[in-house]
Every structure is written in structure tokens, then in C-alpha cells.
Amino acid sequence: MIRRLFWQALALVLALVALFVAIAVVRVGPIDVSGLARHEPGRSAVMLEREREARDQGVPYHESRRWVPLERVSATLRRAVLVAEDDKFFTHDGLDWDEIRISAQKNLRAHRVVRGGSTITQQLAKNLWLGSARTPWRKFEELILAMRLERNLTKRRILELYLNTIEWGDGIYGVDAAARYWFGVGAGALDASQSIRLAAVIINPWRFSPVAPDERIQNRIQMIASRLRRRGAISEEEYRVALGLPPEAAAPAVDSTLLSRPDTTSRPPGESAPPPAEPEPVAPESTAVDSLGATG
């Protein structure tokens, strides 16, 4: 009896999944993904959604967005975003199955969504075409569009689209608009600390501020900065600045003339001066490998 109920329940679940997939395929079918290889997108689903929300609430809506080519975006910002949002971006096919599995397990244990498993490609699909709508088939739409994006566009183009359409505050879209709004500089002039702060707030740009980070964002800043330093993408000094730590104390300067002066110390007759000390061996400087160099 129990076994029969199990198989009946499984059959029902599979039937529902098949139905949702079919609905998703039909709904996203008309979307032109390949055209994004040649031109920039218009206003995204998220932009239109925010405008509707403002209109419904009777509040003014302002939109700031500036398109900037990927090569004109700070390399540290690119790397920080990848570390924060999708560390396997250049190796997956649009879906990170390990992350999906881990997120599903954590969410089931917590009985709520505590961790997302979306890749940058999935986030781009959501931002451009789906918005925040909650339907049983929306996740399938996102998965299908992500796979289509990966088939039709290069990784660099996907990253460029993502950085130019992502939301970074109320009415602020794209990295250049965000850099100018929060820090008064263009996307190419962002320093390491600014880049890390912008990457840290992507999880909820409406709630969190890159210039006044709370404890959760401070923890994310530390995580991103630590990974970038470990991979040689930022220096020790940049790491300390990003975390608000004081600079390391410099070694006291040594007067080089003292090293060459003769020893005039008074000694008993017959006692010779001690031999000069052997110089300390100098360790060879290590070369850091930039594991995110593909985005540089």
C-alpha cells in the first residue's frame, strides 16, 4: 500500500514537472536571445516592473543607466562580481548543478529560501525577461533561457550584458551608473575597495548600501576580499583598505652609511673585532596566479 502511494505521488510530481516545462517552453519560445550578440537590450523586465510599482504607489520614478563595454569596466570589479555571484561562471554551461543541489538542501532544512543557486546567466535571464514574478513554471523559464543564452552568446558577452543591466539601487542600473552614483567615478576608475563593496550588495541592492554596509555586507566584503587576495587579484594593501584595517607598519629606515663604517668599539688589548654578520637569505618573490584572469 505504501509503495503504491509512493509511486502514485512520484507519477503526479513528474506529470506536474512535465506540464510546467511545457508551459515554460511555450512562454519563452518567442524571445529572441541570439539578437543580443549584435545589439544592446532595451529596458529590462526589472526596469518595467519597478516603474509599475512606483506608478501604483504614486511616487516618482527615476531611472539611471549607462551602457559601457566590458573592457572599460574595472578588472577588479569584474573579478569581485564573479567571486560574489558565480565563481564557476567560465566553466559551467549556464547552470551550476552543484550549487543548485546545495541550495535545495539548505532551503529544505530551513523550510524557506535561505540560499539561491542561480548563476550569472540565470540572473541575466531573470533581469531581462522574467522579473520577480512567482509562478510554478518561472524557474523552468529561467533555466531554459539560461541555456539558450549560453548557446548563443560568448561568456564575455553574457558578463557584459549582466553588468550593464543589473540593479544597484533604486532606479540605478548597470555598473557605470552605479559607480557614478555611489562613488562619483566611472566604471573603469573603480578601485578595489569600491569594486568589492558594489559586488557585496548585489544580493539585495534595494536593502543594502555599498557606502554604509551593515554586518551582513561586511561579512560578504571580507569573503570577497579574502578570495581575491588569495588569488593574487588584489594586493595586501588593497585588502586591508577594503576591510578598513590600518596599513601595515613600515620597517624603520636604516642608515646605509652605518653598515660601512669601521668598528671603533673600545676592546681589551688583543681582542679582535667580531666577524661581520652573514646577510640574511632573501626568499624569492612568489608569483600569484590570477585564477580569474579570463575576465581581465
Regions found by a protein language model. Name each.
Residues 1-296:
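Juxtamembrane regions of bacterial inner-membrane/periplasmic proteins
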